[in-house]
Amino acid sequence: MSMTSSVRVEWIAAVTIAAGTAAIGYLAYKRFYVKDHRNKSMVNPHIQKDNPKVVHAFDMEDLGDKAVYCRCWRSKKFPLCDGSHTKHNEETGDNVGPLIIKKKDT
């Protein structure tokens, strides 16, 4: 075996080991890191989790002059807004705000 042939074999072995290590690292990243982000991006973290679909309905006549509803799902007074979206926006970089329903000024 010549000198260039043995160098070529060493390079092939090194590239194979590096590619295998990169593949294992990528699979570990996908398994452990990406999974955590999927759970953190869930819109509703804790409100009525036993219910398959959370729905609230209100009669327009019962709202009064103004009603402010939560859209970030973090409010302790859900479905009403308590300003929790401010902290949520700071933590996530989101820009969600409340839904404000008010009577039209005549």
Swiss-Prot record:
Residue numbers of N-acetylserine PTMs: 2
SMART domains: ZnF_CDGSH
GO BP field: intracellular iron ion homeostasis; protein maturation; regulation of autophagy
Assembly, per entry: Homodimer.
GO molecular function: 2 iron, 2 sulfur cluster binding; L-cysteine transaminase activity; metal ion binding; protein homodimerization activity; pyridoxal phosphate binding
Leftover remarks: Binds pioglitazone, an anti-diabetes drug.
Topology term for the membrane: Single-pass type III membrane protein
Enzyme class: transferase
InterPro entries in UniProt: CISD1/2, FeS-contain_CDGSH-typ, FeS-contain_mitoNEET_N, MitoNEET_CISD
Pfam family, one: zf-CDGSH
Species whose genome carries this gene: Bos taurus (Bovine)
Descriptive protein name: CDGSH iron-sulfur domain-containing protein 1
